[in-house]
Structure formats: structure tokens, C-alpha cells
Amino acid sequence: MMELTIAQAPPTSPGTMSEPEGQKKPYDYQERYRHVRQKPLSVYSVEVKGDERTRPGLFAKVLDPVYRATTLDELRVRCVEANAVLNSYDIFDRVDVEMDAGPREHPDSAKVTVEVSEKKKLSLKGGAYVSQQGEGSMEVSVGLNNALGYAEKLDVEFIKGHERSSSYTLAWNQPRVGNVDVDVVTRAFQQVSCSKRLSSFDETARGISVTAVGGGPATVDYSLVWREIADPTRLASKSVRHQLGHSLKSSVSYTYQVDERDRPVRPQAGYLARVRSELAGVGWDTQMTKFLKHEAEIQAAHTPAEGVTFFASAKVGAMMPLGQNAKD
């Protein structure tokens, strides 16, 4: 939301014949703005209101270009850009930027007021679900939003299945690192997947991951995962028994995704296209898992009538072992 105050309508001069009451021509603010938009000015002050937790340094980085505006039109553009950046942090319910004339003792100056309403600090979610393997699970997640004032988000998630499956995740999301349009998400996790019903094995993965998400459709991810595969039933296939034990995976992946769905869960319209490439074996340990994997996925949803939705998806992929794994 932007408010722009340029000037008040000028009063009628004594020698000017006034128009009959009820027929006054409305003052054309847009025409007045076109005449003065390139007029030189300086920014007298920038005031921030409603910043209860957010650090002043965050506003200083975002609003610094506003101070450098030299014309009214440039000031308008800088304020619109600052408004968009502040909203992109996703820590405010509302961001209002208002421009007004500076004090009379400083002619040709402007003052800017930024008023924000911060989102709640704590969020709590929970639910019960059934996985594709038919295992019921309970999920609880707790989130802290901008608790330290750096626009950070801290999420803790617990998922426990009624069998052996479980997942524990601690995620730290830092938006606009270095004041550029790049979010960095760091995760530490432990995940136990129980596949005894289908493949007679359990998989435990512990590790960390760092994901860089830009303003476009591409993401880059690095993960370091310690994996253990066990056969508690002693009924696993030969190919599974060949993978039993511990392994270390250090990988870099690149994902390009275009998501035009109306919503991510049970979409009713739109499509999703995703391409992902992963290179495992990044590091100094020769015993690490090494492979090159490519995946492509597409989803489409269409609702021809109310209550009727057609959904189609397809996924293909290929993996090529590298190093010692390619010889085995």
C-alpha cells in the first residue's frame, strides 16, 4: 500500500473569478505530479513505526536507496521497491509507505514514513496422516518467526509413525542473505523410514543440508547424509542385502521448477514441471556413495465441473554409478 501526498490544491487568488458553487473543477493531482515529478528534492527523514522485534539494521539496508533519491519520481520508485522488499521477508502482516512534504524550513525536501505490522512470533501446527505405505503418523511442528529480529524463521518438526518410521527436523531459514534476493535454508535432520511391508528393510538417515533459493525457479542444494540400511526381518532381497550397513553421501543438486498450480496440495488447476540433477560423491572420502542422477516430473490438474477434478502426473529418471560403485 502506497500513499503519495504532493501538495494541497492552491487557493483561489483574489483577482480570479471563482466558479459557481457546486461546479468547481476537481483539482488534478496527476497533472500536478507530472509537472513536478522531475523537480530536484532531498529526503529529509525516513521514519519506521511498528518495529517491535525487527532490528533497525534490516530497515537501514532496505531503505538506504530511499535516502539517495534526487527527484520526486525517483523517490516514488524507491519507495515502491522498498515496500516490495519488506513484504518479501514474510515477517509483516502489513507494510505501508507514505511520502509527504518536508518541514517548511527545508524547502524541496520530503519525509518518508514506513509503518509495519509484524506477524506473530510463535506458530504451532499438528495433524494425523496416512502415508502411501499405509502407515499412520502424527505430525507436530513449532515455528518461531523473527524472534531475534533478523527476519529469520526457525522450525522444529516431529513426525512419528505407528510403526518404526519417524522424522525430526530443525530448519533455519534466513531470507535475503547479503540484502540480495537469495534465501538460505539450513536443516539438520534424522529420518527413519520403515519399508518392512513392501521391501523388508529399514533406512535411517542423519545429516545436514543447505539450500539456496533465488527469486527465480532454480534452487541449489548441498547435503551431507549418513545412511544406515538394516534388515530386521531377515527377508530382504539380495539387492537390498548388498546395500546393508552404513554409507556416507555428500551431494550437490540443482532443481529447476515451474509451478503454475492453484495450490500445492490437491490442486484443481494448473501444472507443475520439475527437473532435478544430483551429483553425489563430492568430497575427499573415496568410500562415499558416488553417482549422477537426473529426474524429470510433470503434473497437471483440470476441473471441468464443480466437484470433478482430473489429475495426471508422470516422473522419469536415470542414475549412473560413478567411481568404485560403477565397477561393482
Predicted feature descriptions by range:
Residues 79, 85-98, 104-267, 271-274:
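Gram-negative/organellar outer-membrane beta-barrel architecture
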